[in-house]
């Protein structure tokens, strides 16, 4: 897709009345905005500046090469630019199957070949144009008007001789026979017109000709009824300029299913076509219409490509590559299409093209990542500046206060938050941006990983190492998965030393990433490095525990605003994930020790687990050690619980607790709990909430919790994890405070 599509080298600020300029700027930022393109085209057509119109249409058609051709050609026809028109027809007709475009083409041919002045030669050219058009789009259910145009043209011919009259009759009958077997929208009306015409030509032979086509007509009429039922009379043939992800009204999904029903109907061959190639032609035609109507749905392009490959992979290979390249112009961030095209290039042994396809996707994703990162930095920098201004204002006010107010100021200091406050709107936006950033990070990591694997397959380990180096240089935030996959690739290429070094390199960046530690532990177990396993376990466990402790301490700050509570909720989820990683790490090491270690060490691990997670059921760790690959006998037979050992463990699952206290949900992130909140829950939640005390946390307790010191004040580092017993002891030893 071309960059700098509209921006000039000496670009000036747009005037507020410069609608065209503003639209061009918007399209420079988002070249795939179909609606803005249409507005721009309307604006330039109204201005009627030829060079500007041509420039906009050419840029538009480089992206949407299936749309707006009729509009552009009509503009040139109105100006009498017939040479331009012919060039446009030569560009669009080979790549676009559109009924109205073909009708416009025939209309142009008739305009430039007058049968009155041109005679038989002109008539022959027009007939050829009609034949081209009906061959190209005559099977379309909406092609009835084109066929009728053809018939009307033939019927308007006034023969000069008897043999010409017979030739005219034969031509008309031949067109009718082709027309009547195609299930067009007004097929019954066409049949009625045909039977009337046959009787007018020759009543004695009419029944014979009508009987020959009645069976095929009945099939076509029946198909027409089935088609309307399958598409529920709501199929949209015009462009729907949205994709799956912004399909708020479920329009794309609904239309997609209707197109699939049409394709399924064609596969059933209810028209009883004897030639398989005719069935394939109809299916192909429907796919072409579908991708024109839903151009931003990668799934459709993918299935159309697979259809061509199944039909004749060797013959259609080049067509498939062209199709996927067109699809990626409209869906440049599609993983599905990128991976499919790169595989085709790899199979075709054009490796440079395959890597270029990956690089294009990485470029788009990296730009998105950087844009989101800039937005996050902009919000945080703005809030930091606001905080500094507030602090400066506060210092000025303090200098004006009397010394007698010092005690009151000391009391207020205890309520100050060491971090800046975010507005509700900014906090929500920041949370969404961070989620999107994390998602893009994983996506970029995955694409680099697949590129590395493709290079390993096609060019060997040396080329894959080049990708490993390139990715770390180009995208510093690349995820741990990339290191793990590269290390395993080296290992399976008989490079154990290199694999170990890559894991060691990964430890420098991801020592607090539980998923990386688990993968590294699996690797060490696989290569049977006993001492290294123990060292990694202790290092990883220590790093994760420290990280969790820091998060717990940070969470004890002032969270009086709903905005900060949103951020706190996000951090809490992340903290739960880290705790789950700690559990997995201990369980994995415990299972390893149960096979290759000794019982004393296993018991020591049990004690440490219970110390770190005192609220967890002690049976959980014990039963995990004795579960099989496909069955957990303790959980299933002794505890009577559902056996989930064969299922993948959800790393985001909540912690398993001996008892769970369900606090009522607070909709507006305030400390007060309203009885009205239960109205917004489902029946199950309502029953659960009714069982809990109302107003569980009031303002008094909430304000007390705000000013409590963090966990680091309650003892040595080993006690930094929250201990509810010590909190109860603290409350019990508080002196009685007289109330007024």
UniProtKB/Swiss-Prot annotation:
Disulphide-bridged cysteine pairs: none
Subcellular location: Nucleus; Cytoplasm
Keyword Repeat: yes
Residue ranges, annotated region (Disordered): 381-418, 668-688
A Gene Ontology term for the protein's cellular component: cytoplasm
Pfam families reported for this sequence: Suf
Renumbered ranges of HAT repeats: 48-78, 80-114, 121-156, 167-200, 236-268, 278-310, 494-526
Listed Acidic residues bias regions: 392-413
Compositionally biased region (Polar residues): 672-688
UniProt xrefs under InterPro entries: HAT, Rna14-like, Suf, TPR-like_helical_dom_sf
SMART domains (UniProt xref): HAT
Domain of life per record: Eukaryota
Swiss-Prot/TrEMBL GO biological process terms: mRNA 3'-end processing
Molecular function as annotated in GO: mRNA binding
Record keywords, A-Z: Cytoplasm, mRNA processing, Nucleus, Repeat
Gene3D superfamilies given in the database record: 1.25.40.1040
Entry function: Component of the cleavage factor IA (CFIA) complex, which is involved in the endonucleolytic cleavage during polyadenylation-dependent pre-mRNA 3'-end formation.
Protein name: mRNA 3'-end-processing protein RNA14
Source species: Debaryomyces hansenii (strain ATCC 36239 / CBS 767 / BCRC 21394 / JCM 1990 / NBRC 0083 / IGC 2968)
């Amino acid at each position: 897709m071309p960059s700098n599509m509209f921006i000039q080298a000496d670009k000036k600020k747009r005037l507020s009345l410069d609608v065209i300029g503003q639209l061009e700027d918007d399209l420079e930022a988002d070249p795939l905005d179909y609606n803005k393109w249409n507005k721009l085209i309307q604006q330039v057509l109204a201005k009627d500046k030829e060079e500007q119109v041509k420039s906009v249409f050419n840029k538009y058609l480089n992206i949407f090469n299936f749309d707006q051709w009729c509009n552009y050609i009509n503009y040139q026809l109105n100006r009498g630019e017939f040479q331009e028109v012919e060039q446009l027809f030569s560009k669009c007709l080979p790549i676009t199957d559109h009924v109205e475009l073909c009708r416009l083409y025939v209309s142009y041919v008739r305009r430039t070949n007058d049968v009155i002045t041109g005679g038989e030669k002109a008539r022959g050219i027009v007939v050829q144009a009609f034949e081209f058009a009906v061959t190209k789009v005559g099977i379309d259910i909406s092609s009835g008007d084109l066929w009728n145009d053809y018939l009307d043209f033939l019927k308007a011919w006034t023969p000069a001789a008897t043999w010409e009259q017979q030739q005219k009759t034969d031509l008309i009958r031949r067109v009718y026979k082709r027309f009547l077997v195609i299930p067009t929208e007004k097929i019954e009306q066409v049949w009625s017109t045909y039977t009337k015409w046959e009787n007018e030509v020759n009543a004695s032979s009419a029944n014979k000709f009508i009987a020959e086509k009645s069976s095929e007509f009945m099939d076509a009429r029946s198909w027409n009824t089935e088609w309307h039922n399958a598409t529920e009379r709501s199929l949209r043939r015009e462009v729907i300029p949205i994709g799956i992800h912004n399909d708020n009204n479920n329009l794309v999904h609904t239309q997609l299913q209707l197109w699939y029903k049409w394709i399924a109907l064609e596969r059933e061959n209810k028209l009883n076509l004897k030639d398989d190639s005719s069935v394939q032609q109809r299916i192909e035609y429907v796919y072409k219409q579908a991708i024109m109507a839903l151009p931003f749905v990668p799934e459709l392009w993918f299935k159309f490509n697979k259809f061509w490959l199944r039909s004749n992979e060797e013959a259609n290979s080049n067509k498939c590559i062209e199709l996927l390249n067109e699809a990626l112009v409209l869906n440049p961030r599609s993983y599905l299409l990128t991976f499919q095209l790169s595989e085709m290039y790899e199979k075709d042994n054009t490796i440079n093209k395959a890597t270029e396809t990956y690089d294009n996707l990485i470029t788009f994703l990296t730009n998105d990542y950087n844009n989101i990162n800039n937005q996050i930095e902009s919000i945080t920098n703005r809030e930091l500046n606001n905080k500094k201004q507030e602090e400066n204002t506060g210092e000025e006010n303090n200098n004006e206060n009397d010394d007698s107010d010092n005690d009151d100021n000391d009391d207020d200091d205890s309520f100050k938050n060491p971090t800046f406050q975010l507005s509700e709107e900014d906090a929500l936006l920041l949370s969404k941006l961070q989620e999107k950033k994390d998602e893009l990070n994983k996506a970029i990591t995955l694409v680099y990983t697949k590129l590395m694997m493709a290079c390993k397959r096609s060019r060997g380990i040396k080329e894959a190492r080049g990708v490993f180096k390139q990715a770390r240089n180009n995208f510093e935030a690349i995820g741990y998965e990339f290191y793990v996959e590269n290390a395993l690739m080296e290992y399976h290429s008989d490079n154990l030393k290199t694999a170990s070094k890559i894991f060691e390199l990964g430890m420098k960046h991801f020592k607090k990433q539980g998923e990386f530690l688990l993968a590294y532990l699996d690797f060490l177990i696989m290569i049977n490095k006993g001492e290294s396993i123990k060292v990694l376990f202790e290092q990883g466990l220590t790093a994760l525990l420290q990280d969790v402790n820091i998060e717990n301490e940070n969470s004890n700050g002032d969270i009086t605003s709903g905005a900060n509570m949103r951020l706190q909720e996000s951090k809490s989820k992340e903290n739960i994930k880290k705790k789950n990683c700690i559990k997995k790490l201990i369980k994995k090491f415990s299972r390893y020790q149960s096979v290759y270690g000794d019982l004393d060490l296993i018991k020591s691990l049990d004690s440490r687990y219970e110390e770190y997670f005192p609220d967890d059921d002690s049976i959980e760790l014990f039963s995990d050690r004795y579960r099989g690959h496909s069955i957990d006998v303790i959980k299933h037979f002794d505890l009577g619980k559902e056996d989930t050992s064969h299922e993948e463990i959800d790393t985001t699952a909540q912690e398993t607790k001996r008892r769970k206290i369900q606090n009522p949900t607070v909709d507006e992130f305030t400390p007060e709990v309203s009885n009205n909140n239960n109205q917004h829950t489902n029946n199950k939640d309502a029953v659960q909430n009714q069982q809990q005390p109302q107003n569980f946390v009031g303002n008094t307790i909430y304000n007390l919790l705000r000013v409590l010191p963090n966990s680091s004040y309650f003892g040595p580092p080993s006690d930094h994890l929250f201990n509810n017993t010590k909190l109860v002891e603290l409350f019990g030893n508080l002196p009685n405070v007289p109330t007024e």
